[in-house]
Amino acid sequence: MADAEHERIFKKFDTDGDGKISAAELEEALKKLGSVTPDDVTRMMAKIDTDGDGNISFQEFTEFASANPGLMKDVAKVF
C-alpha cells in the first residue's frame, strides 16, 4: 500500500485534522469496521502508539500499516 493511501486513511481517522489520531478518533473509526469495545481501543492504542504520548502520529500509523498490509487492505475498503 502506497504512502498516499496511508495518508488518505490517516486523514479519515484524524477527524479534527490535528495531525494525530486520538483514542476517541480511533474508536470512532473502528466502529465503522464493526463492533468495538473500549478494551479493543486500548489494545490498539498500545500497539500503534509506540512513543506512548496517547496519540497516533502519521509515522506510527504508517509503520503499523506497513507491518499489517492485510489488515490495511480491509480498512481501505471501508474508508
From Swiss-Prot:
Annotated Pfam families: EF-hand_7
Residues that coordinate or bind Ca(2+) 1: 14, 16, 18, 20, 25
PROSITE patterns in the record: EF_HAND_1, EF_HAND_2
Span of domain EF-hand: 1-36, 39-71
Name of the protein described by the UniProt record: Polcalcin Bra r 1
Organism: Brassica campestris (Field mustard)
Keyword Cell membrane in annotation: no
Metal-binding listed as a keyword: yes
Molecular function via GO: calcium ion binding
Binding locations of Ca(2+) 2: 49, 51, 53, 55, 60
Keywords: Allergen, Calcium, Metal-binding, Repeat
